[in-house]
């Protein structure tokens, strides 16, 4: 049965357009002849748009995006120190507004150490886990302020907001992920100090654990979790945590598995009320924009997350196998200057592999 998905594509700034072109190339290759088609609508959003119009994300933009099924995003951010962007806060005005307006309450970050990819760890073992980070609460809701700013008596605060409703829905999603994987879930928090929020998270995890007896559940303080991420990452299957802790842990997870250049993420509305968004974790790297030096692998892995979210697991696995094969070939070459490929050449290779699988 044929199916058409309405896809928003936001190339963004810097290397964003280059890597997203290769992601779309891989998407088209893997879906050719499958009965799954993507109707793509491109949106010019980001620092360049702001410099041209003074707008980051208008209400009309948001309304148009809401009418689609999913979003594929490249990277957002202008050149650091550009005085024309002073005070614009493009990343917050675009990315956080999309996440909150579209109720992306799950931030999903898979972590895999692919064969042939070097890790800074001496003996990492098998690294294959996902972090399910709450995406719309915690310290990121903007509940804070300052009095007497700029004086020796300044007081500033950021309130972490945790609701039973918000925690329960992200924990349910994490249990579902664990049930589809190796059936282990680890709650990471700081219950010994953050007693109110920590207690809420712990009680909800314990309550839902009774509904999922097949899933083994454990708990780690966030400081202990950082230790185990570098001493025994193979112990993890699904980590569930709040917005701030998840933000920190996921970058550490990327660092032990090849770097953020290989890290993809999903900002997900699991119930499908709004379009979910998929993007590479890396930034816009304006210093190399237009030079065809950016690695599009993370953007292509974002396509795999998109396909998996849409229920197209076989197609997602084809993309993942293509990436695995390409990465193994790269490590075998020990790329010299003459062997280094351009952004589009990497995309061509992965797309060809995805089409064959």
Swiss-Prot record:
Pathway: Amino-acid biosynthesis; L-leucine biosynthesis; L-leucine from 3-methyl-2-oxobutanoate: step 3/4. The keyword Nucleotide-binding does not apply. The record marks 140, 190 as: Important for catalysis. Catalyzes the oxidation of 3-carboxy-2-hydroxy-4-methylpentanoate (3-isopropylmalate) to 3-carboxy-4-methyl-2-oxopentanoate. The product decarboxylates to 4-methyl-2 oxopentanoate. Mg(2+) binds at residues 223, 247, 251. GO terms for cellular component: cytoplasm. Keywords: Amino-acid biosynthesis, Branched-chain amino acid biosynthesis, Cytoplasm, Leucine biosynthesis, Magnesium, Manganese, Metal-binding, NAD, Oxidoreductase. Binds 1 Mg(2+) or Mn(2+) ion per subunit. One of its GO terms (molecular function) is magnesium ion binding. It comes from the Bacteria. Homodimer. The lineage of its organism: Bacteria, Bacillati, Actinomycetota, Actinomycetes, Micrococcales. Substrate binds at residues 99, 109, 133, 223. This is 3-isopropylmalate dehydrogenase. Pfam families: Iso_dh. NAD(+) binds at residues 283-295. Its EC number is 1.1.1.85.
